[in-house]
Amino acid sequence: MKIGILIAGDTEGELQTRYGTFASMFVRMFQQSRHAFSYAFYDVRVGEWPESPEACDSWLITGSVDGVYDNLPWMVPLQQLIVEISQSGRPLIGICFGHQIIAAALGGVVEKSDKGWGLGLHTYNVNADSVGEHPLPDTLRINAMHQDQVIQPPEGAEVFLSSEFCPCAGFFYGKNVVTFQAH
């Protein structure tokens, strides 16, 4: 299986020296599974784009220091690609900024939260009705580091993770899209 990693941001300086890039962190995570994956990397910030959603078997969008509302030039084609991947049926995962830009591309609303920053270990409620055949505990504790949030999920999205601080911390969209605010 070939995973396409759409790079929307990266670590810098000492963090990158110590922990690697966002893309390399995800590769290390996937390497811990029993499955063999190959990878294609697209730095969308500099105009690196796949030929089509079919260029990879599944897709992941990384985090970013940029906000969806910054409307940077690369965000419009990324949102178009998100819609195409969603419609193609290929699996798509969004983490942090990836969660936010997927929501925006599919009709949701993303804003800087009036609650400020969410930092540290947060407890999220799992909506059992939304996860269906994907067994999860009633709550998950995941590190958070964000001030932007999906304020309104896309129509048709099923929110499966929520907290008082972040009511839309993860959602399913159709059968092939899943997103997580925390990481």
Please place each PLM-identified region on the residue numbering.
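N-terminal beta1-alpha1 cap of cysteine-dependent amidohydrolase-like domains
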Residues: 1-88
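Cysteine-nucleophile active-site neighborhood
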Residues: 62-130
